[in-house]
């Protein structure tokens, strides 16, 4: 993951949604969506509902 993708993933792990992440990183929500999509792809997460994929991404980040 890129450093920005790791930042986004860390904020996801803290429970922030896309809007809050965009605000904290001073980027557009569309940019956050792109980073989240890249995270899912790079972690090879299955195409399920977005909430489930976010949980899987956070678990991967935490090493669980």
Spans of features found by a protein language model:
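Helix-turn-helix DNA-binding segment
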Residues: 1-37, 59
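Basic, Lys/Arg-enriched C-terminal extension of HTH/homeodomain DNA-binding domains
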Residues: 40-64
């Amino acid at each position: 993951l890129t450093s920005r993708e790791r930042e986004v993933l860390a904020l996801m792990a803290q429970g922030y949604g896309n809007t809050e992440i965009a605000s904290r990183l001073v980027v557009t929500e569309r940019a956050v969506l792109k980073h989240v999509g890249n995270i899912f792809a790079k972690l090879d997460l299955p195409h399920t509902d977005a909430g489930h994929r976010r949980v899987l991404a956070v678990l991967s980040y935490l090493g669980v």
